[in-house]
């Protein structure tokens, strides 16, 4: 990998990228409120579950969309996007995916200035596609020539950091703890990438009942710091 590709991955994979990720907790807010997550060990387990689920659902969507971009199959990009959106059973998950996806597309047309990204944002605004974050991420990075496995790694990192950053504001956990969790979970990244690179939207699965239960709890929560 050359330095130019690496720095683009770092830029667009940055946890402070202005796409609104800081407003979402990826379910950990309700998990902490209900006591499912209450210490470092349970937080690590929650992140691990989220990464496994992301690999078998959104990650496959990333790969399918990336392959469609490379093949210049714009209908394939849209199919992958709807596949990701339709597998998000709760409204808050769909809101997170589509809001961040649109923000990423809006930002990217000013940064990358690629016709495919302009077309993608137009499809989102016209309602022709949902504009989920995983697929938008694949479109933006594939347009820059970044490989599919690298984009899956970016997506996995984003899932983990969204949860860990939220946990820092919700429970008694230190920066050292969250960085150690992230480092340990990175050992499984190859396995998660292998799952995602199946890339078949017909095999995508979002079956994690606890996530949907926690989402339902979050909707009716009296105090909420995050949007999901």
UniProtKB/Swiss-Prot annotation:
Belongs to the UreF family. It holds the Pfam family UreF. GO terms for cellular component: cytoplasm. Signal peptide: none annotated. The lineage of its organism: Bacteria, Pseudomonadati, Pseudomonadota, Gammaproteobacteria, Enterobacterales. UreD, UreF and UreG form a complex that acts as a GTP-hydrolysis-dependent molecular chaperone, activating the urease apoprotein by helping to assemble the nickel containing metallocenter of UreC. The UreE protein probably delivers the nickel. InterPro entries: UreF (IPR002639), UreF_sf (IPR038277). It comes from Yersinia pseudotuberculosis serotype O:1b (strain IP 31758). Required for maturation of urease via the functional incorporation of the urease nickel metallocenter. GO terms for molecular function: nickel cation binding. Keywords: Chaperone, Cytoplasm, Nickel insertion. It is found in: Cytoplasm. It comes from the Bacteria. This is Urease accessory protein UreF.
């Amino acid at each position: 990998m050359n330095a130019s590709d690496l720095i683009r991955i770092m830029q667009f994979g940055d946890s402070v990228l202005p796409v609104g990720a800081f407003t979402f907790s990826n379910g950990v807010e309700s998990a902490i409120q209900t006591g499912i997550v209450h210490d470092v060990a349970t937080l690590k387990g929650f992140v691990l579950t989220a990464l496994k689920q992301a690999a078998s659902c959104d990650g496959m969507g990333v790969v399918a969309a990336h392959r469609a971009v490379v093949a210049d199959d714009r209908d394939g990009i849209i199919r992958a996007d709807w596949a990701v959106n339709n597998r998000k059973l709760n409204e808050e998950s769909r809101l997170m995916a589509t809001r961040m996806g649109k923000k990423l597309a809006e930002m990217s047309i000013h940064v990358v200035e690629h016709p495919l990204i302009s077309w993608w944002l137009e499809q989102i605004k016209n309602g022709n596609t949902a504009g989920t974050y995983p697929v938008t991420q694949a479109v933006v990075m594939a347009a820059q020539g970044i490989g599919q496995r690298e984009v899956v790694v970016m997506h996995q990192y984003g899932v983990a950091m969204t949860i860990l950053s939220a946990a820092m504001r919700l429970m008694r956990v230190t920066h050292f703890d969250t960085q150690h969790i992230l480092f340990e979970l990175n050992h499984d990244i190859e396995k998660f990438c292998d799952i995602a690179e199946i890339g078949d939207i017909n095999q995508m699965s979002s079956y994690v009942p606890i996530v949907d239960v926690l989402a339902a709890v979050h909707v009716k929560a009296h105090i909420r710091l995050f949007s999901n």
